Regions:
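Transcription-machinery-associated regions
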Residues: 1-65
Length: 65
């Protein structure tokens, strides 16, 4: 199942921060969906840094699909 494989890759290939950003951004694991600005405020980092983390995480996952 592709969804199960994706979740396994999220857990095994991404850093804790990358996982958190994707979980918050896309509402994974029953999380609420947040904007990049909201995530940045929650983590105490800039919105542009959240964007870079998100992009990096998606690129890592793209290698497998």
């Amino acid at each position: 199942d592709v969804i199960k494989m994706l979740y396994r890759k999220v857990e095994s290939e991404l850093s804790p921060r990358e996982r958190l950003v994707l979980k918050m951004r896309y509402g994974l694991y029953n999380e609420e969906e947040y904007t990049q600005r909201e995530i940045a405020k929650h983590l105490g980092i800039s919105r542009s840094y959240v964007s870079r983390i998100e992009k990096s995480a998606i690129e890592k996952l793209r290698e497998y699909f």
